Amino acid sequence: MEITVSVDVSAVRALLNSQSRRINLAMRGGINDATALLLRDMRTYPAQRPGSSYQRTGTLRNSWSRRPPQGHGLDMYGVVGSDPQIAPYNAQVQHPELQAAVHVGRWQTTETVTNLRRGLVQQMFDDRMREAFAGT
């Protein structure tokens, strides 16, 4: 046994369609804010181990980049990624499932950064939407 309730969302759909420019601007701003933050976090190296003579090259840092926002409206998305052509070892350092034991607990993974920043990223989008629709 079940109850089905249907509602007419045409007014909401019309409102969203009439506000597509504002939605696009807010989404683009939120994506730019979020990808800049995540890129910075993924490029951040932990402190070097005391007594280590290894000279860091910055190659892993330089392998990380972000692409401009893709898509349209509420389907817009951003991408932050590490290029394995630049740093072939990137997964052994920052991939949550492939990280080498020597790096566990020292280097942030994509998963730890995602979990750490989820709330702040949501706040960035909320702020951009509020800003886009202020006064309407």
Where in this protein do the model-derived segments appear?
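Disorder-to-helix initiation segments
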Residues: 1-21, 106
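Short, low-complexity, charged/polar segments at coil/turn and helix-coil boundaries
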Residues: 14-100, 123, 131, 136
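Short helix/strand-capping connector loops at secondary-structure junctions
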Residues: 94-113
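Protruding loop/beta-arch "assembly-hinge" segments enriched in small, turn-prone residues
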Residues: 110-136
